Amino acid sequence: MEKRDYYEVLGLTKDEIKKAYRKLSKQYHPDLNKEPGADEKFKEIAEAYEVLSDDQKKARYDQFGHEDPNAGFGGGFGGGGFGGFEDIFSSFFGGGGRRQDPNAPRKGDDLQYRMNIKFEEAIFGKETEIEIPKDETCETCHGSGAKPGTQPETCSTCNGAGQINQAVDTPFGRMMNRRSCTTCHGTGKIIKEKCSTCRGEGKVQKRKKIKVSIPAGVDDGQQIRVSGQGEPGINGGPAGDLYIMFRVQGHNDFERDGDDIYFELKLTFPQAALGDEIEVPTVHGKVKLRIPAGTQSGAQFRLKDKGVKNVHGYGMGNQYVTVKVMTPEKLTEKQKQLLREFAEISGDIPEEQGSSLFDKIKKKFQGE
C-alpha cells in the first residue's frame, strides 16, 4: 500500500510546517534555552525539518526510518521506534503544538525475548510454550494505582494537563517553554492513597505462559511478533507486542547458509578412485548418492530440495555434499606393498620408505 503524504494525512501545509519549525527552533535554541538537552533537541529539530522539507529524504524516511535499507530480516527491534527524532516529528505534526491529554489511552511498551531453539526446530518449526516475566494490569485497582474506593486527584500544579508552561524572556520577546510537570511526572494525576497491591504503579509483575509457534525455516537472528503480549496499555490503551528473537543452536554434522544445508562426506581413497553408491544423511532422512569413479577431494554434489523450507514460503533449499578424501594414517605392510605396486604401474614411484635422515646421509657419503 502506497503511503500518503504526511501533510495530506494531517491536513497541514508546508507553510504551517515551516512556522512550527521556526517556533520550535526558537524555543530550543541553545542561546535561549539553558535546560539540559536543549541543544540536542535543537539539532534534532533542524534535522527533522531538513527531512520534511525534502521530498526525496522524506520518502526514504517513510520507507526505512533510521534503519539501513540493506539490513537483513530481524536486524532491528520490531522494525520500529525512532526515539527522540520521532518525538520531533510529532511536534511538527501537532503533538508539540497542542497539549496532549495525559489521560488519553496509550499503547503499552513492546517487549523482546530471546529464545534458544535446536537446529531441527528451526528447520521444521514447532508449537511450544514460554514463560516470561511481564507486567500485568493490577487487578486490585484496575490500573488506576489508587486504593480501592478512592480515585486519583487532578494535579493542582498543571491542572491535569501533565505539562506546565514557563515564560522565558528572549531577544525575540517573551516565549513560553513547555515541559513535563514535575509534581505529577506528566500524568496529570496525584495518587494520595496508593493501592497496596501495586504500590501506586497500576501494574504488577507476573510470570506468564505464552504459546509460541516457531515458523518452519526460521534462521538465527530472525524474530516474530506476538501481538498484544507486551506491557499493558496506559489509561485503558491496548497492550504492546512481544518480539521473539531466535537463537539457533549449531549441529554436529550440518551447516546452514540461508535455506541451504552443507554436509562434508568423508571417502576412502578406493571409494573416490573406483566410485561407490553410499547413503548420505540429510535433515529429511538418508538418501543414496552415487559417487563417480575418479572423484576428487573438494568435489560437490547437490541434493535438490533436501535443504530448508523458506520461512516466507518461497520453495525449498538444497543440500550440498562436499567430498573429503581421507588419507590413511597407518598402513600394514601388505597395504604398503600394494600401494608401491600401484605407484610403479602409474609411473609415480615414491622415495624409499622407512629410511631415516641419518641413513640417507650415510648412504650419500658412501656413494650408494
UniProtKB/Swiss-Prot annotation:
Q: Which SUPFAM superfamilies match?
A: Chaperone J-domain, DnaJ/Hsp40 cysteine-rich domain, HSP40/DnaJ peptide-binding domain
The record's comment on cofactor binding reads:
Binds 2 Zn(2+) ions per monomer.
The CXXCXGXG motif repeat boundaries are 138-145, 155-162, 181-188, 195-202
A GO MF term: heat shock protein binding
Please list the cofactors this protein needs: Zn(2+)
Cellular component terms, GO, for this chain's entry? cytoplasm
Is Chaperone set as a keyword in this record? yes
Zinc fingers (CR-type) at which residues?
125-207
Q: Which CDD domains match?
A: DnaJ, DnaJ_C, DnaJ_zf
For the ligand (Zn(2+) 2), the binding residues are 155, 158, 181, 184
Any notes on this protein's domains? The J domain is necessary and sufficient to stimulate DnaK ATPase activity. Zinc center 1 plays an important role in the autonomous, DnaK-independent chaperone activity of DnaJ. Zinc center 2 is essential for interaction with DnaK and for DnaJ activity.
UniProt function note: Participates actively in the response to hyperosmotic and heat shock by preventing the aggregation of stress-denatured proteins and by disaggregating proteins, also in an autonomous, DnaK-independent fashion. Unfolded proteins bind initially to DnaJ; upon interaction with the DnaJ-bound protein, DnaK hydrolyzes its bound ATP, resulting in the formation of a stable complex. GrpE releases ADP from DnaK; ATP binding to DnaK triggers the release of the substrate protein, thus completing the reaction cycle.
Family (UniProt): Belongs to the DnaJ family.
What's the name of the protein?
Chaperone protein DnaJ
